[in-house]
Amino acid sequence: MRCLTIYTWTFRRLPFIPSTNSASFFSTLRFNMSTANNTQAIVIGGGLAGLSATNTILDLGGNVLLLDKNTAFGGNSVKAASGINAAPTQLQFDQHVSDSVNTFYNDSILSAKSKAKPELLRTLTSKSSSAVDWLSERFGLQMDQLSRLAGHSEPRTHRGTHPDYPFKPLAFVLVDQTEKFAASHPDRLQIKKNARVTRLLTNPNHDKVFGVEYMDLSDKSNHTVYGPVVLATGGYAADYSDDSLLKLYHPEALSLSTTNGPYCTGDGHKMVMSIGGSTVDLDLVQIHPTGFVDPKDPTALTKFLAAEALRGSGAVLLTSQGRRFCDELGYRDYVTGEMMKLKSPVYLVLNSAAAEEVANFIKFYSFKGLMKKMKAEELCSTLNCTKDELASTFSEYNRAAKGEIPDEFGRKYFGKTPLELTDTFTVGEVVPVLHYTMGGVQVDTQSRVLSTNGNVIDGLFAAGEIVGGIHGENRLGGSSLLACVVFGRLAGQGASSTMLRRFIASSTSTASS
């Protein structure tokens, strides 16, 4: 059973309270599930999707075994600092932003292009507001700043404004609270890191999953555990091995660096494929236009992402001749495509007002040596252009921002202006990088994994980047974290229902025997 949320016209939330009988039922269920054998869910992956599923199951009274092959939880989610999309929200209302589920959905459909799956995008967008509410109310996250990222027609990307935010993205809060819960409630939640799942346990027809086998990497011991399974193992954009899905489906991408952690190797995809699970669009990989070039290690295989929030605040992309070449807030595939046509380096440039708006990001990137403050003379030297050439670029941009002329590249939202030669600039070199695998395991709108014949595989759920098809050909910035929460919660609800159904079936069988 779910708690519903009713919105008044001011979007202020009024809770719908379950009946006393419902509360009693869940209390009884929690007791029964905690004392029965094999009544746990197994969540694989400790990123935002896995943590969302885990905490949803715990809230519904279930027990969880949380496995992660890494030595720390968080996955790629702890790198995501631009924020999470949602519409409509109280924060948008307070800031007089007119947005809706339909507007968000339409933006997402346009971005997804021919590969759009309307039913999944409708699920994603319609549950976005409740996802942000859940993060705020369940974990105390303060989402009090809005950004307009590339491809969005309204500011709808929510993030916090804590001074340490780039160092503590929202996933860190879930990691911390989940680990504390495990320490205080070991009967409800067990966590095992350094645990690599090697096989899904199924019936002979592969249409029912009832557990997994995993290896403890610290001592190489093998273990078998039982329960419905939630796969939240991430994508495969860091797998450069000979048997990688990248090499098999998108080999040209292997020449690029990645923003992904080394744990993103498609393990979950391969396990699902081995039991006849369906996949979709494995050849589609999102190449993000702005990965920082580290001056200390320019050819590094792993690069830091230059968050899209920088361009949202007003950053421009300039060639080594001091010229713009694209709408900086166009879709990611468009900006990347324009960059790849160039023969010269590209620099991300913020004026002082834009840098102030994203000051915590700038602080972090500057600390890492990825960005540098400079005056116009040094900027011209860096770009290998004259002051007159830079002044011409700035003048055209400022006039377009004022509405005096159309922008040459169609940019509509300009952020902090004007750009002036007397200002101080924050600058970093950027290149396209592997960022997100669009393809993955095929699920329905309840996060249930489907077989190649289109049927639901009982007891197997997936959420996060392992899931394919949600974002079509091109993902909007801020929608990856949203998909983790929305489909993570759905997977958690599904795993809880499966535990209940199997518990009742087991109890009935025992009683009749």
Curated annotation (Swiss-Prot):
Which Pfam families does this UniProt record tie to the protein? FAD_binding_2
Q: Which UniProt keywords apply?
A: Cytoplasm, FAD, Flavoprotein, Mitochondrion, NAD, Nucleus, Oxidoreductase, Phosphoprotein
What EC designation does it have?
A: 1.3.1.6
Query: Which EC class is this protein assigned?
Result: oxidoreductase
Q: Which cofactor is essential here?
A: FAD
Q: Please report which protein family the annotation says this sequence is part of.
A: Belongs to the FAD-dependent oxidoreductase 2 family. FRD/SDH subfamily.
**Disulphide bridges in this chain?**
none
Q: What is this protein called?
A: Fumarate reductase
As to how many cofactors bind and how, the note says:
Binds 1 FAD per monomer.
Location of this chain's protein in the cell: Cytoplasm; Mitochondrion; Nucleus
Q: Which residues does UniProt mark as catalytic? A: 288, 311
Which terms under GO biological process does the entry name? Answer: fumarate metabolic process
What is the originating organism of this protein?
Schizosaccharomyces pombe (strain 972 / ATCC 24843)
The protein's matches in InterPro entries, at most eight in alphabetical order, are given as: FAD-dep_OxRdtase_2_FAD-bd, FAD-oxidoreductase_2, FAD/NAD-bd_sf, Flavocytochrome_c, Succ_DH/fumarate_Rdtase_cat_sf
